[in-house]
Amino acid sequence: PVTLHNLMRADRAAKALAEAAVFGTGPAARFPLEVGAFLKSDPGRDLPDLQSHFLPGRSTAALRLPFARGDARGHGYFANVYQMRPDSRGEIRLTSPDPYAAPAIRGGYLTAPGDIATLRAGVRALREIFAQPPFDRWRGAETGPGADRQSDAELDDWIRATAESVYH
């Protein structure tokens, strides 16, 4: 298999990390985000407004012990999609004249109506990519958002429930 599943066993992960640290080789010597893409939510846009990262592993993967029973989730892959320039705006406010006091932060994620539509277009673009014949051998059931979520409203609910910021 070509995923990271086998490396999610603690003894194998430790061996791979040691090999990477000592020799600079092996599966842990490179970052596992295999592919990145810039996409347009609308073909009429001049520039891409979405970014995606592909990982050859399940988003639900967890490190497991060698003597534990196998991970039923097994092999898989996933991709995330992010809006590069959202219209939504949050705010950071001072809560006190004390410079050490924590500020009040409101993210304001997905408050601009166009942002959710942009992310929805990104989810649909990833579905289209993963529906291509080269993925036939590896494709299983879609776990997120799930094949049962097809309408705009269903996808919007899923996006609101799972979206997070990755930019730093």
Give the positions of each predicted feature.
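Acidic/histidine-rich catalytic neighborhood
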Residues: 1-16
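FAD-dependent oxidoreductase catalytic-site/capping-region signature
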Residues: 17-168
